[in-house]
Amino acid sequence: MAKVQYFGTGRRKKSVARVILVPGDGKVTINKRDIEVYFGLETLRYIVNQPLVLTGTKDKFDVIVNVNGGGFTGQAGAIRHGITRALVKADETLKPELKKAGFLTRDPRMKERKKYGLKKARRAPQFSKR
């Protein structure tokens, strides 16, 4: 018998997360490591689990994630986006609830490019009057 799997791709800043939802007991694996090992901060684990807790599907699916690029916060946001998309594929009735919470929306904020003549994107070199 073929296993039922739901796929979702999430993005945030420079991070890309490929998420697979498999019916199970709520185990979250990120890059072949447990979520507690991968994300040390409680806030990042909270961000990842938000869509599952909101929809009440925390202990119905095992989450397998492959994520790369960006930093910890970007990766957590990308995983949340991917889980949300996979949940919508699994059950279309969850879409309005997830949309209202803002989890389906791709966060468009990216790092602003550095401009010439400046030290960073907006930081100007120190000004000296004399």
UniProtKB/Swiss-Prot annotation:
Keyword terms, alphabetized: Ribonucleoprotein, Ribosomal protein
Record InterPro entries: Ribosomal_Su5_D2-typ_SF, Ribosomal_uS9, Ribosomal_uS9_bac/plastid, Ribosomal_uS9_CS, Ribsml_uS5_D2-typ_fold_subgr
UniProt xrefs under Pfam families: Ribosomal_S9 (PF00380)
GO CC terms, sorted: cytosolic small ribosomal subunit
Keyword Ribosomal protein: yes
Positions with biased composition (Basic residues): 111-130
Cystines in this chain: none
GO molecular function terms attached to this record: RNA binding; structural constituent of ribosome
Sequence similarity: Belongs to the universal ribosomal protein uS9 family.
Protein name: Small ribosomal subunit protein uS9
Organism of origin: Clostridium novyi (strain NT)
